[in-house]
A protein has these predicted regions:
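Short acidic-aromatic low-complexity motifs
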Residues: 17-20, 58-60
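A short helix-loop-beta-strand connector motif used in the catalytic cores of GNAT acetyltransferases and
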Residues: 53-66
Length: 175
């Protein structure tokens, strides 16, 4: 049985009440390089994205799940985990994780990743998950390598920044 409850966090569907926290994440300029964003998101755009989540992943080809944890006796949103570029024919999807700054380094990303892998394998019947990580994103490299993802390629000088070009490391995990 697939359980979206990890040992320290749980995953749930997006709700309209998640708009404010999503607005903060999606408009954090430091994260744009990771997400590929180049401009701010409006509340209207994010409201539409939340509404779109009511549709099946087979229609939208993506799914965002909210990561919740019990913090000081209260259920709090600590992050989100995405399945993206869902490809049911080849039974694979990309995966991405965001944890709010104040909740990082507590194991939430690793626990959420285990949950979404179980969901991907047990419900979506996926064969593999993949991700791409900038070479300077040490925390994400450690997360995916520690979860058994294997480096399967490098895109040299793939991400342009004001400081210069960064390579992107490709990881995949056969489920």
């Amino acid at each position: 049985m697939v359980n979206l409850q990890g040992s320290i966090c749980s995953l749930r569907a997006l709700e309209p009440s998640d708009l404010d926290v999503m607005y903060g994440w999606e408009n954090e300029v430091e994260l744009w390089r990771t997400s590929g964003a180049t401009a701010p998101f409006s509340r209207h755009q994010l409201t539409s994205l939340i509404a779109e989540q009511q549709y099946d992943i087979y229609a939208t080809r993506q799914l965002r799940l909210v990561i919740e944890a019990d913090i000081d006796g209260e259920h709090r949103v600590v992050g989100a985990i995405d399945l993206l570029d869902f490809d049911p024919q080849n039974r694979r999807a990309g995966v991405g994780v965001i944890i709010s700054a104040e909740y990082r380094r507590r194991g939430f990303a690793a626990d959420a990743l285990r949950c979404v892998e179980e969901y991907a394998r047990g419900v979506l019947m996926l064969h593999q998950l993949w991700c791409s990580v900038a070479e300077d994103n040490v925390a994400s490299i450690a997360l995916f390598a520690g979860a058994g993802y294997e480096q399967c390629g490098i895109r040299r000088e793939w991400i342009l920044t004001p400081q210069g070009a960064l390579s992107e490391i490709l990881f995949q995990k056969i489920l």
